[in-house]
Swiss-Prot record:
Lineage of the species this protein comes from: Bacteria, Pseudomonadati, Pseudomonadota, Gammaproteobacteria, Pasteurellales
Domain of life: Bacteria
Source organism: Pasteurella multocida (strain Pm70)
GO BP annotations, alphabetical order: 'de novo' pyrimidine nucleobase biosynthetic process; 'de novo' UMP biosynthetic process; glutamine metabolic process; L-arginine biosynthetic process
Signal peptide: none
Residue numbers spanned by region CPSase: 1-185
The protein, known as: Carbamoyl phosphate synthase small chain
Keywords of this entry: Amino-acid biosynthesis, Arginine biosynthesis, ATP-binding, Glutamine amidotransferase, Ligase, Nucleotide-binding, Pyrimidine biosynthesis
Function, as annotated: Small subunit of the glutamine-dependent carbamoyl phosphate synthetase (CPSase). CPSase catalyzes the formation of carbamoyl phosphate from the ammonia moiety of glutamine, carbonate, and phosphate donated by ATP, constituting the first step of 2 biosynthetic pathways, one leading to arginine and/or urea and the other to pyrimidine nucleotides. The small subunit (glutamine amidotransferase) binds and cleaves glutamine to supply the large subunit with the substrate ammonia.
Domain Glutamine amidotransferase type-1: 189-376
Record pathway: Amino-acid biosynthesis; L-arginine biosynthesis; carbamoyl phosphate from bicarbonate: step 1/1; Pyrimidine metabolism; UMP biosynthesis via de novo pathway; (S)-dihydroorotate from bicarbonate: step 1/3
Length: 385
């Protein structure tokens, strides 16, 4: 027998539906994602920490869940909202239904609500806090819980999802019949800051010949430089970048070292802050797998995967920071680079997962920057000996 559930937004909007996950209640910032597929990657993306995700595509769960399509070791989204959960799931890799997966991972979730109406509210009023409650339902209590969550602005969540200790990553991307391929040859030593890093980012770096040392969010620049990296990667992650003063300070020191630096998502925003710019909260952010972005260097347009609620404020950027990519949905900054050194970043997700791989070339750009830096060092050494 299905158990009733409700979703209550901080503005008082109430949606009645059916529980498809764990019992109890959950609170978080309610956002909408327009991707048609990839619900397992979305649920396990650390960038969704403290967020309740609404999937706008009506049928979610058709292919079940599996052991491979995870972006972290557990679910980070605070809750899930969908229109319809199919009675059957089918896929040759499937090991569990979405319902069982949500219950196993203790995720509170609701189905059978009008996600179209909900999305219009979030679009028109902006992302807002909400509460999903199952079983013994108390609308007044749910509204109180939603209002108590507050805003994402000012929340430093990166240190909450970051690894507690340094570890090495060598696994490449998944291949049919082979699984995840271990990379035994490494040309580059990369230190990756974990602000909530997605596994597919690490896989794509490993596949390009990188031995990756993943370090906690609060690792000092001195500790990173002591590892003698060829390049430094700044990962994606949840929350507001501005309170992450420990990361901004470390990045400023790392910029002075002139080592190649590449940032994605939160890492992009932190690079912008470290370079002297500012960030600001967006109304409802970008969450989806079909966002057109223009590369201003080539004028080419790419379809990208996006997941962020904050953006770099273009008007605040100093003269040595150049905008390289722009969203064709709202003209927001999607990429920057520093004119005086090898440091660049991208707001969307080149690693996709889920989504298109149109901008995977940015990983190749990072590889080329490290190769150039190493050749330059070698030339300098030879010239002086």
């Amino acid at each position: 027998m299905s158990e009733p559930a409700i979703l209550v937004l901080a503005d008082g909007s109430v949606f009645h539906g059916t529980s498809i996950g764990a019992k109890g209640h959950t609170v978080g910032e309610v956002v909408f994602n327009t991707a048609m597929t990839g619900y397992q990657e979305i649920l396990t993306d650390p960038s969704y920490f403290r967020q309740i995700v609404t999937l706008t595509y009506p049928h979610i769960g058709n292919t079940g869940t599996n052991l491979e399509d995870c972006e972290a070791n557990h679910v980070y989204a605070s809750g899930l909202i969908i229109r319809d959960l199919p009675l059957l799931h089918s896929n040759f890799r499937s090991s569990m239904s979405l319902r069982d997966y949500l219950q196993t991972h203790n995720v509170v979730a609701i189905a059978d609500i009008d996600t179209r109406r909900l999305t219009r509210i979030l679009r028109d009023k902006g992302a807002q806090a909400g509460c999903i409650m199952t079983g013994e339902i108390d609308e007044a209590k749910a509204l109180e819980l939603a209002k108590s969550f507050g805003s994402m602005a000012g929340k430093d969540l990166a240190q909450e999802v970051s690894t507690g200790e340094i570890f090495t990553w060598t696994s490449g991307q998944w291949q049919l019949g082979k699984g995840f391929i271990e990379q035994t040859q490494a040309e580059f030593n990369v230190v990756a800051y974990d602000f909530g890093v997605k596994h597919n980012i690490l896989r794509m770096l490993a596949e390009r010949g990188c031995k990756i040392t993943v370090v906690p969010a609060k690792t000092s620049a001195e500790q990173v430089l002591a590892l003698n990296p060829d390049g430094i990667f700044l990962s994606n992650g949840p929350g507001d970048p501005e309170p992450c003063d420990y990361a901004i300070s470390a990045i400023q020191t790392l910029l002075a070292s002139k080592k190649p630096i590449f940032g994605i998502c939160l890492g992009h925003q932190l690079l912008g802050l470290a370079a002297g710019g500012k960030t600001k909260k967006m109304a409802f952010g970008h969450h989806g797998a079909n966002h057109p972005v223009q590369d201003l260097n080539t004028q080419k347009v790419f379809i990208t995967s996006q997941n962020h609620g904050f953006e770099v404020d273009e008007a605040s950027l100093p003269s040595h920071v150049r905008v390289t990519h722009r969203s064709l949905f709202d003209n927001s900054v999607q990429g920057i680079e520093l004119s005086d050194q090898s440091a660049f970043s991208f707001q969307g997700h080149p690693e996709a997962s889920p989504g298109p791989n149109d901008v995977a070339y940015l990983f190749d750009k990072f590889i080329n920057e490290m190769r150039k830096a190493n050749l330059s060092q070698l030339s300098t050494y030879v010239a002086h000996h």
